[in-house]
């Protein structure tokens, strides 16, 4: 019985000692983070897709804080770009670059008759929009898919295709900038 109590006491003392060392190290080696980077990172969709040219959302937030273009986040879309513009105090820009028109939103589509159930696409999807099991066909949850295109390359049978999102009453947007509204002048 004393051996058990001794072992428990030794482990408790070791835990206390390592806790004190870790606490000291956390205070001694603390790195101040830029609050604007944290705010920008919170606005980004956290898909870690890399379409902006950076390996994830945090590096893109750091680049934004250093003056990079605010319109590179394709999965975040126009709404995210406008929130970033408001936070940074700059004018909104067209998505994808000043010379580019707004990109057509696409989602992944799996040709289920060709799918071998290897799960490589599931592992590549940063938002878990692909469901399926090993050696069973997979499918994409279209409402969750951001169109990041990361699932296409790992597929060994090339059964994944990026297709445009069909226009429905849920996603249709009226281009009010190009609509002429007749005005009757009352005197």
UniProtKB/Swiss-Prot annotation:
Keywords: 4Fe-4S, Cell inner membrane, Cell membrane, Electron transport, Iron, Iron-sulfur, Membrane, Metal-binding, Repeat, Translocase, Transport. The keyword Ligase does not apply. Belongs to the 4Fe4S bacterial-type ferredoxin family. RnfB subfamily. [4Fe-4S] cluster 3 binds at residues 125, 145, 148, 151. Its cofactor is [4Fe-4S] cluster. [4Fe-4S] cluster 2 binds at residues 115, 118, 121, 155. The gene is rnfB. [4Fe-4S] cluster 1 binds at residues 49, 52, 57, 73. Part of a membrane-bound complex that couples electron transfer with translocation of ions across the membrane. Residues 106-135, 136-165 form the 4Fe-4S ferredoxin-type domain. It comes from Aeromonas hydrophila subsp. hydrophila (strain ATCC 7966 / DSM 30187 / BCRC 13018 / CCUG 14551 / JCM 1027 / KCTC 2358 / NCIMB 9240 / NCTC 8049). PANTHER family: ION-TRANSLOCATING OXIDOREDUCTASE COMPLEX SUBUNIT B, OXIDOREDUCTASE. It is an enzyme of class 7 (translocase). Pfam families: Fer4_21, FeS. The lineage of its organism: Bacteria, Pseudomonadati, Pseudomonadota, Gammaproteobacteria, Aeromonadales. It comes from the Bacteria. The complex is composed of six subunits: RnfA, RnfB, RnfC, RnfD, RnfE and RnfG. Binds 3 [4Fe-4S] clusters. Residues 1-26 are annotated as: Hydrophobic. The keyword 4Fe-4S applies. This is Ion-translocating oxidoreductase complex subunit B. Its EC number is 7.-.-.-. GO terms for molecular function: 4 iron, 4 sulfur cluster binding; electron transfer activity; metal ion binding. One of its GO terms (cellular component) is plasma membrane.
